Amino acid sequence: MTFRLSRFESPLIEDDGESRASLLGYSPENELYTDVDENRESRFRRFMSFISSSPYDMFLAINEHVESIDWDSKASTIAGPLGNFFTCSLYTARLLQDSLIRPNQQKLDKKRDSFDLSRSEILRKFEYLSQVPKSGVVVTHLNWYWKFLTFLNVALQITVGFLILINLFVAYKFLIGHFQVYSLFYTKTSPRSKNVTKRSLSDLSFKSLEEVTNSSLWTMIRYMFVRKRLIIKDAPKGKYYYQLRKWTPGKFYTALFSAFSPISVIFLLVTEVSFKTALAVIGHQYILFLVLFKRYESRLDDEACLAKAHFEEINEKVIKPKTTIKTQDAMVDATTYGGGAAFFPSFTTTRSHIFQTHAVTGDIITERYNPETRNFEDVENTGRAKNYISQIQGVSHGQQVVSRSKAMNGATARPQFFSRQPSPSKIGTPSIILNYRTSPFSAPTTPTLKPVNGVQNGQSIFRNSPDPSKANSLNCDTSHLSRNNTLSRLRRNSVSPTKSGNYCSASGMRAIHKSNFGADSSVSYSMEAPSNELPFEEVARRGRHPFEITASRDLPAGRSSAVSSRHSSISPFKGNTSFAGRESLDSRPPFR
């Protein structure tokens, strides 16, 4: 085991005192005595203080030593044989009393020299007394036997009394001595138990307990024996709680009580003990030990195993998935340029196995516990951000490629699309057949207007596509998708305010479609048109790249209304008329 002096120094605690003293800057020369003298004096002082201490301190020290022993583990090895020894001792004592002491009880109690005529001085004067044969040898021979029986009688009485006291102590510790009190604060209904009482919440206040302890002796006795057994029946809702007083005897006293029970003691005391009585005592010992210790304690152990298994199942299925969620502190880029997210390690989880401590020098040390090696390991670079989504070098923010299924902390991130180009499909979900990147530009403008003639028009449409390889691959006729079709979904929901008039009547360019509802003059979504007038064909050729400054001089004169219409129309289904074979992947709703 080590202790941290600094971030880079962690000496072992098992080292000698001189190395630790040198590291801490401690010099024993400043002390008045060495460690050896201190140990010698401490032993002497400890012995003197133990002798001169009060009896209560000695009792407390002995009690602490006794309570520190794990008695439950010694139930089968000590308690059972000890109880059987006590029962056998009581049976032997009662057998000797009934078979040896009781028949000679009269001889033991009376005086043996009461009728000894040889001691009388008056009878010694007569000659007749000298003719009577003397039996002094027989009396002397039996004298030690009566004395032994008298001593044995006293010893057996003391033994029986001592065994009765031990049995009373064991019965008290088993039946009354072990109880645990539980407070059921979240139980709404009364439990079906005789050991449950209804208590007031005012009894839990420190003030009430302090008042009881500082009051008279009679008040404390009344509180202990009267108030604690008071059952509150009509307490208001939320002002009471239930208290359970559970009987919890240990395995040691259970084994000792079953092997040396009060039933066998009472049976041996009230009956005349003989050799036949041993059969009843042995049978009683076996049955009681089997019922109480073997079956009853085994049942409690089995219930504990089932409760543990049930708790482990709940822990694995419910508690652990909710409390061990891997979390991180994230910093997400919320700008319109796209970008990524920076993730920082989070130390707020309850099961992160990461601890922050301070060394002797004041350095902050971050350690992580490794269950495999059972050691603490230093965690480096804990404050450095870890970018799981980073930008590709040489690609701008708008053209940043974002993973479609990036997994972050177990969740899959949805694909990001930087284009606001509306999808021509009825549903707004991305298509699964598109394998090219979306447009990096975001503007609430109408997609490219498609002329109906020429391959150049098809090429101008694919200038809107973010994939340049598609620009020269169109060699199909798209004249069947004319905008004269009023039932086409490409013109549905169009609310452009500039489509109600004949602003474009050139043949082959764009057909006039008069709205059935009249001009949408109440709501205007138009944007400012560019200062320079561009021809409509040039606008159609450029597509969504208005930053090009090279314009063809061979095209007919443009109309500013067409440019304004391009910038003001916000129809959600007017873009990408050539959707044969491909669809847009824009999953965002149309701009309205």
Swiss-Prot record:
Localization of this protein: Nucleus membrane
Topology in membrane: Multi-pass membrane protein
GO biological process: maintenance of rDNA; regulation of exit from mitosis
Ranges of Low complexity composition bias in the record: 560-571
A single cellular component GO annotation: nuclear membrane
InterPro entries named in the record: Nur1/Mug154
Superkingdom, natural source: Eukaryota
Main localization (coarse): nucleus
Record keywords, A-Z: Membrane, Nucleus, Transmembrane, Transmembrane helix
Spans through the membrane: 151-171, 255-275
Region Disordered, annotated ranges: 547-592
Function of the molecule: Member of a perinuclear network that controls recombination at multiple loci to maintain genome stability. Required for rDNA repeat stability.
PANTHER family: NUCLEAR RIM PROTEIN 1 (PTHR28293:SF1)
Protein family according to the UniProt entry: Belongs to the NUR1 family.
Protein name per Swiss-Prot or TrEMBL: Nuclear rim protein 1
Lineage: Eukaryota, Fungi, Dikarya, Ascomycota, Saccharomycotina
Gene designation per UniProt: NUR1
